[in-house]
Amino acid sequence: MQVATRLIQAMLTVAAVLLVESAALAQAIVQTNSAPNPYRAIENWAKLPEGRTWGSTNAVDIDRDGVSVWVAERCGSFAPPSMMKPGLPFACSDSPLPPILKFDASGNLVKSFGAGALVLPHCIHIDGEGNVWVADGLGKDGKSHQVIKFSPDGKVLLTLGKAGIAGNGPDEFNAPSAVLVAPNGDIFVADGHGGNTNARIVKFDKHGKFIKTWGKKGSGPGEMDIPHALAMDSRGRLFLADRGNNRVQIFDQEGNYVDQWFQFSRPSGVFIDKNDIIYVADSESESVAKDHDGWKRGIRVGRVSDGVVTAFIPDPVEKATTTSAAEGVVVDAQGNIYGAEVGPKRLMRYIKQ
């Protein structure tokens, strides 16, 4: 009898734990579309040279001066990775235009470079020394599947990955989506863009020497589906936009799983400022991601400390059939938000009202 009683008590305890976990998860995935929007949109803020038009872009970051904005755009083309067709002109591989652009605080173009060096720029990251890192996505004609480090003036300083060769070895990528450099110089690459590409994070030292990799395709803790963007908080934790799983995953720098957040919708871009405010861009809900209906596209703002969403900037395009709203997001020292958009082909600026 005592054995049976203990067994029943144990089963009830397990059930209670599962119930609490289920309740917590249910609370975490409550839609956060109704948070207030204290921002006003500014279109056409960044000024391109006469005759040049914006291409698709999700690659945007802030210079170490805190106000200048760096962008890697796809050379005037509409070029999401899913549209890549062998043998056809595609993005920057067939363009003489420089894809890496730097704008001052007034939106004036002050620097550009990278012509002929990139195929599909998917992420731009400015490290603590001001160097410019680009994750160059899908390969074409012997190029790409690489991460490239440029000096602030456009000199190639380091290249990771094999040009045009997709793989999952320690010196290979398959459609790298994002790169981030830690304060100590360690390099983290989010490697993969869905389909038959990879689903992992790769870590290198500051010289580009392979350290480790973690993650695989799946939806469990530590697994990934389209690892799309990276950010780091003041505690040194990595935040991954795990887009295919509609969540943000949190890891330590050794790859140990910490947590997962669903309240930031379907994340394409993620940025954390010096005050540990997190900004997450959703460019696909109710358009490309039909399985995420009910969630609204836009930029969600929240706190790293507790994950609470405090503001929501909705997509200026109410109805869309393709990727829309910001796919990349960044914030300057004054708190202005910049959203890089693939579908509408533009860079939006949002200022507090």
Q: In which residue ranges do the predicted regions lie?
A:
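N-terminal secretory signal peptides that target proteins for export/translocation
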Residues: M1-L7
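Residue-level detector of intrinsically disordered terminal segments
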Residues: L7-A10, A28-I29
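Bacterial N-terminal signal peptides
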Residues: Q9-A23
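Eukaryotic scaffold repeat domains enriched in small/polar residues
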Residues: Q27-Q353
